[in-house]
């Protein structure tokens, strides 16, 4: 897999078509293949799904690793957009991934702030002892 990663990491990658003619892979295709091979080489699983895919509330909750009632609260509070074509809510994968990225960013920012506060308190305590 290492050699395949090297090939896919090149600026331009060509494959042979049915009649033997070379075809250059478009950059988004090459990047996607690179990420797939990288994940597989690290023993990770992969899933390829269209980003416009609509999920049930249970599928969405499973993806976010939260309970369905918690997800429904997030939907009803307007934190994640959803559609309700009939009686059931549907959530787009795009909306879930955006929410997931936003919460990760918020968590990192909060952790950074806590770290800075703790460092400041530690420095103040050390300064008092001197």
UniProtKB/Swiss-Prot annotation:
InterPro entries linked: DNA-bd_dom_put_sf (IPR009061), HTH_17 (IPR041657), SinI_DNA-bd (IPR010093)
Stretches of the chain forming a coiled coil according to its record: none
Single GO MF annotation: DNA binding
One matching Pfam family: HTH_17
Keywords, ordered alphabetically: Toxin-antitoxin system
Protein purpose: Possibly the antitoxin component of a type II toxin-antitoxin (TA) system. Its cognate toxin is VapC50.
Protein's name according to its UniProt entry: Putative antitoxin VapB50
Protein source organism: Mycobacterium tuberculosis (strain ATCC 25618 / H37Rv)
The encoding gene: vapB50
